[in-house]
């Protein structure tokens, strides 16, 4: 289970020194649009939409913007009604590191072209669908924060149908489950008094590539920064592991 948190830990540590924190308004709004389009445009009845709205509010996106995004997804907005779809792209970074990119786009050709340029300029290459996804498993993950009694967390996790959990920090834990059980697990944890700060689908690497070369590490983080900076990109996942010391040198 330790492998679950390697990429998640890298992302958390990287966020501390990143100039940009979290997602842009554009990326968060698109998540709402896609969620509203893929289900009913009512957050009370659409878990994906409810989660997207919670993330937008946490990023201080105004309610007017949130309502506009819901209307766009529902097709009831009077202005621009561009149709966004969720697409997964796959490729390799420097040293053969596997990279998955989840995107929300209204123009597949534009997104693919932007990604291809990002990869080629940073020592990687955009591959075909399926070239690296077999190295990952998709899971539902609930992030729990606050003072955590591990015994109580174990009991609540079992009750909620979790597969495993991991204490990641003094006051943070991640609980893993099948993607179809994420909403039920999140609700069970909340009912048991836990503060669930995020509930998301996450790609978990089945194995990790150890990165020890400083130049490779810098190239990897530059590539990931470039990919994450694209408006169409929602999330980037990679299957490498790195020491905290080398990571600090690579992203400073």
From Swiss-Prot:
GO biological process, one term: regulation of DNA-templated transcription
Molecular-function GO term, any one: DNA binding
Xref: NCBIfam families: PRK00110.1, PRK12378.1, YebC/PmpR family DNA-binding transcriptional regulator
Highest taxon of source: Bacteria
InterPro entries: Integrase-like_N, TACO1_YebC-like_2nd/3rd_dom, TACO1_YebC_N, Transcrip_reg_TACO1-like, Transcrip_reg_TACO1-like_dom3, YebC-like
Protein name: Probable transcriptional regulatory protein Npun_R5651
Family: Belongs to the TACO1 family.
The keyword Repeat appears for this protein: no
GO CC terms, sorted: cytosol
HAMAP family: Transcrip_reg_TACO1 (MF_00693)
UniProt xrefs under Pfam families: TACO1_YebC_N, Transcrip_reg
Subcellular location: Cytoplasm
Organism: Nostoc punctiforme (strain ATCC 29133 / PCC 73102)
Entry keywords, A to Z: Cytoplasm, DNA-binding, Transcription, Transcription regulation
Principal location listed in the UniProt entry: cytoplasm
